[in-house]
Amino acid sequence: QVVDAAMIDGVAAMGALVAQMRAIRYWSDDPAHNFFLHSSPFYESFVCADGRFVTLGAIEPAFYAELLRRLELDDVDPARQYRSEDWPALKARVAERIRSRTRDEWCAALEGSDACFAPVLSFDEAAAHPHNAARDLFVEIEGQRQPAPAPRLSATPARSPSAGVRIGEHTDAVLAELGLDEDAVVRLRAGKACA
């Protein structure tokens, strides 16, 4: 049996919760509403001139040096990468530089380099990305796009994921299994204790 376990498959599988939240409209594709706080200038998402985002992940020194070169920040000493006292001012400069071009312009300038860069894609853009499409990274289940199972096993392929459920879709069955009668379920719903 061949185990096909690409890193990108694992990334998509980790997005299963996001896919489910998106299916029930608890997720916004606007990165401004889905962010993590980082303090360094080399591991962060930045807004571009068009309001879209790119993300940087140049943790290793060689990649950081390439990122600085590609951003044309030639006066920044790559040897000071981990000097956190430099980070606030440099992060502001990186943000200003990234804001000078659109996301697509940054893709053209940085894709294929060792700058550890990626565009921040919406869920639909990620599914349509040529690399992800070539790997069949996403599947359609009852009109819902979901990450394909990972890892991929040649002799024992995984089952397709099931479609996401609506909030409260299985409430009656679960409460009945727990021994609650119909009157108890009505009271729980009236008290907004369940959907």
Segments from the language model and where they lie:
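Flexible, small-/acidic-enriched active-site or ligand-binding loops
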Residues: 78, 141-189
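Aromatic-enriched alpha-helical interface/lid elements that frame and gate functional surfaces
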Residues: 37, 41-113, 117
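A glycine-rich dinucleotide-binding beta-alpha-beta segment and adjacent secondary-structure elements
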Residues: 111-161
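Helix N-cap/coil-helix junction residues
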Residues: 73, 132, 180-181, 193
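Short linear loop/turn motifs
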Residues: 78-91, 121-128, 144, 184-195
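Active-site-adjacent "lid/gating" segments in soluble enzymes
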Residues: 1-54, 58
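Short polybasic/polar patches that bind polyanions
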Residues: 69, 111, 128, 176, ...
